[in-house]
């Protein structure tokens, strides 16, 4: 099964509403979202945390971009178990989840990003997390991989460039092998 958990920045970059990313990055995000609409599974949480974040940051009722249209498609298909899997995640404290595989690593994550990891880990197939623009994930992907969760960096050159700008005194971490 081809399933994925999709970080919100993939939708935002596909919309062209996340500044500082290359045309190639935007095209990649657009292509991956369009491919996902044609085939494969999107994994979200059953309490709609991910869908609420998507809705808050996009315009599914007035779609102008591919990310908006993707969310509209996702909302229309959320009850279709062949295209959307919903998993339960258990909040244990504000922004923390029992399904997050590593408590120490969870402390390093932005609270808004923790749900993506918890959802991937709660799903029986441990689907990859699509990540396009958040450079902090470069510091986390190796620990996540040790827990059985892969991070698929859709825009590796862009995310490494963002990392270099944010952390000029540190070399960008390596990327996962393709």
Residue ranges and their predicted role:
Residues 16-24, 57-61, 102-107:
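Short, flexible/disordered intra-domain loops and linkers
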Residues 1-2, 62-66, 177-178:
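An acidic, glycine-rich, mixed-charge low-complexity segment common to nucleic-acid enzymes
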Residues 83-129:
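Active-site neighborhoods of divalent-metal-dependent phosphate/nucleic-acid chemistry enzymes
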Residues 36-38, 48-98:
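PIN-domain endoribonuclease scaffold, especially VapC-family toxins
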Residues 46, 124-178:
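Acidic, PIN/NYN-like endoribonuclease modules and their adjacent C-terminal/linker elements
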Residues 1-46:
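Short, well-structured N-terminal submotif of metal-dependent ribonuclease cores
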């Amino acid at each position: 099964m081809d399933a994925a958990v999709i970080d919100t920045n993939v939708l935002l970059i596909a919309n062209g509403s996340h500044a500082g990313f290359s045309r190639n990055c935007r095209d990649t995000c657009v292509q991956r979202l369009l491919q996902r609409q044609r085939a494969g599974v999107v994994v979200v949480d059953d309490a709609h945390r991910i869908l609420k974040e998507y809705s808050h940051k996009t315009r599914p009722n007035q779609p102008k971009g591919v990310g908006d249209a993707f969310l509209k498609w996702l909302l229309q298909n959320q009850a279709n178990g062949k295209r959307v899997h919903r998993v339960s995640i258990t909040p244990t404290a504000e922004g923390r989840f029992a399904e997050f595989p590593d408590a120490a690593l969870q402390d390093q994550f932005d609270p808004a990003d923790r749900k993506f990891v918890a959802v991937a880990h709660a799903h029986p197939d441990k689907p990859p997390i699509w990540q396009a623009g958040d450079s902090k994930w470069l510091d986390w992907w190796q620990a996540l991989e040790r827990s059985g969760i892969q991070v698929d960096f859709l825009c590796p050159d862009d995310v490494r460039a963002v990392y270099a700008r944010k952390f000029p005194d540190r070399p960008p971490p390596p990327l996962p092998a393709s």
